[in-house]
């Protein structure tokens, strides 16, 4: 025991007693099939996750760069490398420091134009794989049916939610995650904890009034709460629906040595909720000893992770280069991060001036975005989010 600090031992055993994982350091690298034109060598991305004494956390890595630089392509190749038949290293190669594979892989993307890997595509059946998104993988080749309808989202949420609240460990983790998300005032107003608690007495009276079997009573309980939860969920904004759907599935499916891969989670969220989500994700990854890799345009996300966990992608044409930012990013000013990542001074270009002027006049990201009538590129949206976030937090 003398090789471990009192704090580390106390925290580890407390976490294990609560159903969490033993936190260990681990590392892995992804070797791309693409070459660095300047050296002729394969491009590499290195990842190192620290278990204990991990402040700021190193369990979230970010791939960031200008629009069109290839972030989404890279994470898709990562997924194919891990999940598909890759004997010839067509999609690249993962090398893990522990010599094994990830236990779970969770792929999160809410793009309507996504082309996700399905469970049928998974070559190594020992790996648990879960896709969370807006494509119904049962009909991925049928353009009429492939997109999940918004009226299907409540049931998608409820099925995972029901599994979570029926598990003591998962339910506790869910409550912790919601508490972190509630640091965003708009999320706190949802009062998610009351959705079920206010109706429990009504359910108890219903069940006491019946003489049905335990199985039938369980079905009554599930259907009773399904109606309540679906009704509450249906009232939410699209951003709140997506964040809840994401978090409840992460709580449900993330286990030790899980790799979570996410594509542009900021697309549906306003900046304060982006920050809260990243903190909740990091807490969950720490509890389960997992790691997340996020492809993003968002300086707000970069602000939540240290420099060593940010891979900046640069290049043009066939040329690609991966490097860490020159500045420390955790908690850094968003203007400094934007300048570092996108390579120009905030306010030095024409569209920046317009974005800043609109941000100064509006009191929410949604209102600022509406000002542009759908005519903003992804990069500009990220910068507008950063301006609004700075405004709301000063």
Task: Please provide the spans of the model-predicted regions.
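Eukaryote-specific, cytoplasm-facing alpha-helical/coiled-coil scaffolding segments in long proteins
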Residues: 202-206, 276, 361-366
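Extended helical coiled-coil dimerization/tether regions that scaffold
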Residues: 1-54, 99, 112-119, 134-241, ...
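Active-site donor-binding loop signature of nucleotide-sugar glycosyltransferases
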Residues: 110, 127, 133-136, 315
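RecA-like P-loop NTPase motor core
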Residues: 148-185, 197, 283, 300-303, ...
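Short alpha-helical segments and helix-capping/turn motifs at coil-helix boundaries
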Residues: 10-14, 86-95, 385
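AAA+/P-loop NTPase substrate/partner-engagement loops
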Residues: 88-120
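Switch/communication elements of ASCE P-loop NTPase nucleotide-binding domains
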Residues: 38-93, 221-354
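Short secondary-structure boundary/capping segments
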Residues: 118-129, 308-311
